[in-house]
C-alpha cells in the first residue's frame, strides 16, 4: 500500500508540473513498454 500511495503522490506532482496531455502520453508509453516486455518475456523464457 505504501508503494501505491507513493506512486500516486508522484503522479500528482507530475500532473501539477506538466500538461495533462504529456502525462497521458507518458502513461500510454509506459503501458506499451510493459506489454512489450511481458510478450517478449513469454517468448524468451520457454526458449531459455
UniProtKB/Swiss-Prot annotation:
Keywords: Membrane, Transmembrane, Transmembrane helix. This is Uncharacterized protein SPAC823.17. It is a single-pass membrane protein. Its main location: membrane. The chain crosses the membrane at residues 21-43. It comes from Schizosaccharomyces pombe (strain 972 / ATCC 24843) (Fission yeast). The lineage of its organism: Eukaryota, Fungi, Dikarya, Ascomycota, Taphrinomycotina. It comes from the Eukaryota. It is found in: Membrane. One of its GO terms (biological process) is vacuole-mitochondria membrane tethering. GO terms for cellular component: mitochondrial outer membrane translocase complex; mitochondrion; vacuole-mitochondrion membrane contact site.
